[in-house]
Regions:
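Beta-rich carbohydrate-recognition modules and glycan-binding surfaces
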Residues: 1-177
């Protein structure tokens, strides 16, 4: 059985860091940097208006010094437990950026160590664009298990892996059927 309509995770109708898509739980985005492991990357996550659209804007300087190299906007997918996304084919994100490459990191109940995730890269051009990332194209990172879509826990939009200036805005995040 497949879903017939997208599952909206965030449409930026909220003026703060919390998603408010009208579902039963409103989760809040949070900024995570490599400072949790001794890195020196610096980031900010704040609501913004870009080219007429409300969005969250992830900005900062990513530095690979001290074994670092990331800043991330992270969203827990279900406050009540784990989210079952088996009836969806992937994640759709409306993005506006600075022509850099960013990552989507998806975590589930099997990703118990902080660096484990399922990943895909995407370009964020300096104009609004909808990016579709099929679940089938997510690559496991430091985990041997295939992606179990029935137990999703968190997603992250990440500037990672190289020295760079991050400037990524996202206005809508959903699972698509």
């Amino acid at each position: 059985v497949s879903a017939t309509a997208p599952l909206l995770l965030d449409d930026r109708s909220s003026a703060n860091l919390c998603s408010d898509p009208g579902n039963n739980s409103s989760a809040c985005w949070r900024l995570v940097t490599d400072g949790v492991m001794g890195g020196v990357s610096d980031g900010r996550l704040q609501p913004a208006q870009i080219d007429g659209r409300s969005c969250l804007r992830l900005t900062g300087a990513v530095s690979t010094l001290n074994n670092g190299g990331f800043i991330q906007a992270s969203l827990d997918l279900d406050n009540a437990g784990l989210l079952d996304a088996r009836t969806y084919r992937g994640i759709e994100i409306d993005v506006y950026g600075n022509a850099e490459t960013y990552n989507l990191h998806l975590r589930n109940a099997d990703t118990r160590i902080v660096w484990q995730s399922y990943r895909a890269s995407f370009q964020a051009p300096p104009r609004w664009q909808t990016v579709r990332l099929p679940f089938a194209e997510l690559q496991p990172y430091r985990i041997e298990k295939p992606l179990d879509l029935s137990r999703l826990r968190r997603l992250g939009l990440v500037a990672i892996g190289r020295d760079m200036q991050a400037d990524l805005c996202f206005a809508r995040v959903s699972f698509y059927p």
